[in-house]
């Protein structure tokens, strides 16, 4: 059985120093359709950048730029 290829952290590859909470288009990629923050093994981020993404998403939710949950049906 072959091992799946390991995902490369996008932020490390692009040498991103700071993940801005105001960049909602970037942060929406790391939120599920239910509004949850995607896991590191799903998103492919390294541990440091996953923490930074989580903090940015939480700040963005606090500032009402991103929703806490998915929209009701």
Swiss-Prot record:
PROSITE patterns: RIBOSOMAL_S18 (PS00057). Disulfide bonds: none annotated. Belongs to the bacterial ribosomal protein bS18 family. GO terms for biological process: translation. This is Small ribosomal subunit protein bS18B. It comes from Frankia alni (strain DSM 45986 / CECT 9034 / ACN14a). One of its GO terms (molecular function) is small ribosomal subunit rRNA binding. Binds as a heterodimer with protein bS6 to the central domain of the 16S rRNA, where it helps stabilize the platform of the 30S subunit. The keyword Heme does not apply. Keywords: Ribonucleoprotein, Ribosomal protein, RNA-binding, rRNA-binding. Part of the 30S ribosomal subunit. Forms a tight heterodimer with protein bS6. It comes from the Bacteria. GO terms for cellular component: cytosolic small ribosomal subunit. It holds the Pfam family Ribosomal_S18. The keyword Cell membrane does not apply.
